């Protein structure tokens, strides 16, 4: 197997979170941005895309922005939500910002956000 084939196999095995982290690491190392360059020729395509109906988002990601002052309560809630062990939940809370739940429905994401905020955390939904 060639180097490139091995690289493709390794990259294909990454999770979405690992791929996003890899992207950020490469941006920092190479001093570039993954944002698409804006071109004048792209303007007509953008106008056509704007005319298309906007689909409502159905899957949400709950992100723990900050563990807050009551980290023990937040760790308990994170464990209840994610079924993580004590150490993993503690690492997640102390390593904020971190993703708590991916692919959640709108209601589920709102419920998780409410639980974590009541425990003292700062939470964002994307």
UniProtKB/Swiss-Prot annotation:
Xref: InterPro entries: Ribosomal_bL12, Ribosomal_bL12_C, Ribosomal_bL12_C/ClpS-like, Ribosomal_bL12_oligo, Ribosomal_bL12_oligo_N_sf
Keywords, in A-Z order: Ribonucleoprotein, Ribosomal protein
Domain of life: Bacteria
Any one GO CC term of the record: cytosolic large ribosomal subunit
GO molecular function, one term: mRNA binding
Protein's name according to its UniProt entry: Large ribosomal subunit protein bL12
Organism placement in taxonomy: Bacteria, Pseudomonadati, Pseudomonadota, Alphaproteobacteria, Rhodospirillales
Family, similarity comment: Belongs to the bacterial ribosomal protein bL12 family.
Gene Ontology biological process terms in this record: translation
Pfam families: Ribosomal_L12 (PF00542), Ribosomal_L12_N (PF16320)
Subunit composition and interactions: Homodimer. Part of the ribosomal stalk of the 50S ribosomal subunit. Forms a multimeric L10(L12)X complex, where L10 forms an elongated spine to which 2 to 4 L12 dimers bind in a sequential fashion. Binds GTP-bound translation factors.
Function recorded in the entry: Forms part of the ribosomal stalk which helps the ribosome interact with GTP-bound translation factors. Is thus essential for accurate translation.
Keyword RNA-binding appears in the UniProt entry: no
């Amino acid at each position: 197997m060639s180097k490139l084939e091995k690289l493709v196999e390794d990259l294909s095995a990454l999770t979405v979170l690992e791929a996003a982290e890899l992207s950020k690491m490469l941006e920092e190392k190479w001093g570039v941005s993954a944002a698409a360059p804006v071109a004048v020729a792209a303007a007509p395509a953008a106008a056509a895309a704007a005319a298309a109906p906007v689909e409502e988002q159905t899957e949400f990601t709950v992100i723990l922005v900050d563990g807050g002052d009551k980290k023990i309560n937040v760790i308990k809630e994170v464990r209840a939500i994610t079924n993580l062990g004590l150490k993993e939940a503690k690492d997640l809370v102390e390593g904020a910002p971190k993703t708590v739940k991916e692919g959640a429905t709108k209601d589920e994401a709102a419920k998780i956000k409410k639980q974590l905020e009541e425990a003292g955390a700062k939470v964002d939904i994307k």
